[in-house]
């Protein structure tokens, strides 16, 4: 965000290129939790997709967060994302209303039916107040465009049950749980900490895929201070503060969030340093530095 609260699209483009070229991200989610999706307008969401697609070209896929607590609105956002050039959709469970399982299935099916894009379901009951049951996910796995799960349920047994009964691609949606999820069949992560330790996350994934569990475990343990630091407050707040510390697009947040305090920034500096993140010296700026918006 710019100082006056507007979306800085130039900053978003700069950050997108950094995440792909420097942090080795193979895909980007636009309008997710860290991108403050609840407080951006539909028009802003569309423009962000277009800007990020232009910035990364064919170097990474662009997935649009389109989930809301209104089915018809989510369907319209999905159609808008397809028109804007998104490569896929990420759809969080509808929040606040606490739908029953059959209603959740109907909600996700309506969105998946509305476009030709592949779709990931975001299961995060800590934010939505309702968890997706195993049988619900198994049933949804039969839809040809529902291809995977962003899993932030924090229940390895439940995740394992779905993995065992479906071909859904399971991505961790909680950074500290990535390695445990890989051990039961997960394939990757949709990450917050990849904003600062992307290459190390890639190295952990590669080590695990190569059967080098000790190396994967060491990467996992070495990143724990970063995981702690970026979640001491809401992820968008702390990630934007981290981007500012790195001389990258960060900027403010929209209410009801507040920016990180000076005390929080100081603690975050210590956390990142403990996690092996090299921060620019005071007054030193990256060539790509500018005020902007975290995706």
Residue map of PLM features:
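Positions that flank functional sites
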Residues: 35, 96-97, 126-127, 178, ...
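Short helix-capping segments at alpha-helix termini
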Residues: 54-60, 84-85, 115-117, 141-145, ...
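Helix N-cap/beta->alpha junction signal
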Residues: 70, 174-175, 261
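Structured C-terminal cap/extension of enzyme domains
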Residues: 182-295
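A general structural signal for well-ordered alpha-helical segments in protein cores
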Residues: 12, 45, 49, 74, ...
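Residue-level signature of catalytic and energy-coupling elements of molecular machines
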Residues: 5, 149, 268
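Active-site beta->alpha loop and helix N-cap motifs at the rims of alpha/beta catalytic domains
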Residues: 1-129, 137-139
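Catalytic alpha/beta core domains of metabolic enzymes, predominantly
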Residues: 113, 125-231
């Amino acid at each position: 965000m710019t100082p006056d609260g507007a979306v800085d699209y130039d900053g978003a483009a700069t950050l997108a290129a950094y995440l792909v070229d420097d942090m080795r991200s193979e895909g980007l989610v636009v309008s997710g939790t860290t991108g403050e999706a609840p407080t951006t307008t539909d028009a802003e969401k569309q423009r962000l997709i277009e800007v990020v697609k232009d910035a990364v070209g064919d170097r990474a896929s662009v997935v649009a967060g389109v989930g809301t607590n209104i089915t018809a609105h989510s369907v319209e956002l999905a159609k808008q994302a397809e028109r804007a050039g998104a490569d896929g959709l990420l759809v969080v469970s509808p929040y606040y209303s606490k739908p029953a399982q059959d209603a959740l299935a109907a909600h996700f099916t309506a969105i998946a039916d509305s476009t030709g894009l592949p779709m990931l379901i975001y299961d995060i009951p800590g934010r939505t107040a309702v968890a997706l049951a195993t049988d619900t996910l198994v049933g949804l796995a039969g839809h040809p465009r529902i291809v995977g799960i962003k899993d932030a349920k924090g229940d390895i047994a439940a995740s394992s049950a779905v993995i065992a009964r479906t071909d859904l691609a399971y991505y961790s949606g909680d950074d500290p749980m990535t390695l445990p999820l890989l051990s039961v069949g997960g394939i990757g992560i949709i990450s917050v900490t990849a904003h600062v330790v992307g290459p190390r996350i890639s190295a952990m994934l590669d080590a695990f895929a190569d059967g080098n569990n000790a190396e994967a475990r060491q990467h996992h343990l070495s990143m724990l201070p970063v995981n702690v630091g970026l979640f001491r407050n809401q992820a968008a707040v702390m990630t934007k503060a981290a981007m500012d510390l790195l001389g990258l697009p960060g900027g403010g947040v929209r209410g009801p969030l507040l920016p990180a305090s000076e005390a929080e920034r100081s603690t975050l500096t210590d956390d990142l340093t403990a996690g092996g993140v090299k921060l620019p010296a005071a007054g030193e700026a990256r060539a790509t530095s500018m005020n902007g918006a975290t995706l």
